[in-house]
Regions:
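N-terminal amphipathic/basic leader segments beginning at the initiator methionine
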Residues: 40-98, 107
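Glycine-rich phosphate/diphosphate-binding loops that line cofactor/substrate pockets in enzymes
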Residues: 55-60, 133-140, 336-348
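Hard-cation-handling environments
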Residues: 243-440, 445, 449
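Intrinsic low-complexity, disordered N-terminal segments enriched in polar/charged/small residues
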Residues: 7-9
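Extended hydrophobic packing segments that form well-structured cores
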Residues: 127, 318, 430-525
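Conserved anion/nucleotide-ligand pocket segment
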Residues: 212, 221-260
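Active-site histidine-anchored catalytic micro-motif
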Residues: 64, 68-70, 119-126, 136-228, ...
Length: 525
């Protein structure tokens, strides 16, 4: 058996450690770098890298690009047992335009379900991604698009394990850049494998392009020899639902602004530049030892500076821990419906947060639909409920027909039975397994649960602003809907994405942690 074949048989344990001598920082010292603070000068971050001259510019630098991402909800009743694959984009990032680089595309892999990733599926997906890397060798650098909250049976934090295995293939000298969602649960040991670690700074997310651009620029500067990135990850013992840490509300807005300031000005007492600073909220619906908030710093050549910046930001987050609250209007189910009906606004969006598909919940709970019908609400739209069998019944009946349907609770059965009632098939969406039905005064989109953008309504022939109430399966509204919603109320409904995380049956979370152990004390040093 060849070496590539043999390497496919390796195990992926949760405590995996890949040992490699890493590149020395630019001062030539051994890591961690020990600096003697000799100045209070605050130093700016890396200069733009686009067009930077690379050594030996006649030979393109080969950058392997791949993706491996998931926001795992371990409270989802079903495991994710399959991945979808696509070839990564082969075009240079905007930050690399004009530079002599060759993008070597690998695979992008993502689980097709929302629940805990099965061990076999994760192993297979990792091996496929790693095989494309082995085939691409030698490479000068690696660029990975990750999420940070993938959790697999028998493997644990799968994205961190993947980065470790990538390091074992490319060796200690090739820089590895990674981008993340700020809802990732980031293990401290990730910093031992990745060089350039950059996450989103906005929730709701509006800075994907900027995050990729920053990581790409730092990677190009690294290849040019103008920076030598080293990273530090510092976990913070706080678990919060993401809706309590939105960058549109305090205290998280100011905390992220401080991270931006650290990027611009550096950290007092250290001359090294801070190339990237990310505050991670974490994903509360992933039950794992790494679940929770953290700080991720990439500095130029000084692990001491990276650690100092991480400590500075972690202390500020910890001091603000009791101030975190929902960054949007919220209410219990009945109260939220009553507020919406009494609202002066022409349309009120209600988000069914417990069944939030953007937090990898099932998207098939009929709780809000049932209550709207029970209260004889008119002018409401539920967008939507995932229920393929109900859609098939509608397709067989045809538009304009009335039939008795059992809706929802096909996957998530822990929070009540399906909704049963007479439904009129209003419309069948062309070339899509989607049906729109009317039950009393409520219209329901069946077959697609994830409505996060106005374009999805348009594709179904719907104008959400023609309804008094629009129910979507989100927590906070994504930017596209937030931009059109006259008013939004987040319903505190049960489900795999329950915002009241104290009701979730954690078994693997760290202890002690705030707010579960409210008197938790911690010092960062």
């Amino acid at each position: 058996m060849n070496r590539a074949g043999a390497s496919r048989q390796q195990d992926f344990p949760e405590n995996l450690v890949v040992s490699h001598a890493r590149r020395k920082p630019q001062n030539g010292g051994q890591e961690p770098v020990k600096q003697t603070p000799n100045s209070n000068t605050l130093i700016g971050s890396a200069s733009p890298a686009a067009g930077v001259a690379l050594p030996d510019s006649h030979t393109p630098r080969r950058i392997f690009v791949a993706g491996f991402a998931h926001e795992t909800n371990t409270f989802h009743p079903l495991a994710s047992t399959a991945f979808s694959f696509a070839q990564a984009a082969d075009q240079p990032l905007p930050a690399w335009q004009g530079a002599n680089v060759l993008v070597v595309p690998g695979l992008s892999a993502q689980p097709s379900g929302g629940g805990t990733v099965s061990q076999d599926a994760c192993r297979e997906a990792m091996n496929k991604v790693l095989d494309t890397l082995r085939s691409a060798m030698p490479v000068d650098a690696v660029f990975l698009r990750l999420h940070g909250a993938m959790y697999a049976q028998g493997i644990g934090p799968a994205e961190t394990v993947l980065v470790a295995l990538v390091r074992s293939i490319v060796g200690p000298r090739a820089p590895i850049a990674c981008t993340f969602d700020l809802h990732g649960n980031i293990p401290a040991r990730l910093a031992g494998f990745g060089d350039i670690l950059v996450g989103y700074k906005t929730a709701p997310h509006t800075d994907h392009a900027q995050t990729v651009d920053l990581a790409g620029r730092i990677l190009l500067d690294t290849l040019a020899g103008s920076v030598r990135p080293v990273s530090s990850v510092l976990p913070i013992p706080i678990i919060l639902p993401g809706e309590k840490a939105m960058t549109t509300a305090e205290p998280f807005r100011s905390l992220v602004e401080e991270a931006r300031r650290v990027e611009r000005q550096g950290i007092r007492g250290h001359q090294a530049k801070i190339l990237a600073a990310t505050l991670f909220v974490g994903c509360a619906w992933t039950d794992s030892p790494d679940t929770g908030m953290s700080v991720m710093i990439t500095a130029d050549g000084s692990r001491d500076a990276a650690r100092a910046a991480a400590i500075h930001l972690a202390r500020l987050v910890w001091e603000a821990r009791r101030q975190f609250a929902f960054g949007c209007e919220s209410a219990e189910l009945d109260e939220g419906i009553s507020r919406a009906l009494a609202a002066q606004e022409s349309t009120v969006f209600l988000s069914d947060s417990g069944d939030n598909v953007t937090a990898s919940a099932t998207g098939d709970l009929p709780l809000v639909l049932r209550r709207l019908v029970e209260r004889n609400v008119a002018g409401a739209l539920v967008a939507g409920i995932g229920d393929p069998p109900a859609v098939r019944q509608c397709l067989q009946a045809g538009a304009g027909k009335t039939l008795r349907l059992s809706i929802g609770a096909g996957v998530e059965t822990r929070f009540g039975p399906p909704f049963a009632g007479e439904a009129l098939v209003v419309r069948l969406v062309e070339n899509a397994p989607i049906a729109i039905v009317r039950i009393g005064g409520v219209e329901v989109v069946l077959g697609q649960a994830g409505f996060t953008d106005p374009g999805q309504f348009k594709a179904c022939g719907l104008d959400p602003l023609k309804y008094k109430i629009v129910v979507v399966k989100e927590g906070y509204l994504f930017p596209g809907l937030a931009g059109i919603a006259p008013r939004h109320i987040m319903l505190l409904t049960p489900g795999a994405g329950d915002m009241r995380i104290e009701r979730l049956a954690y078994s693997r979370r760290r202890k002690p942690v705030f707010p579960f152990e409210p008197e938790t004390n911690v010092t960062f040093s």
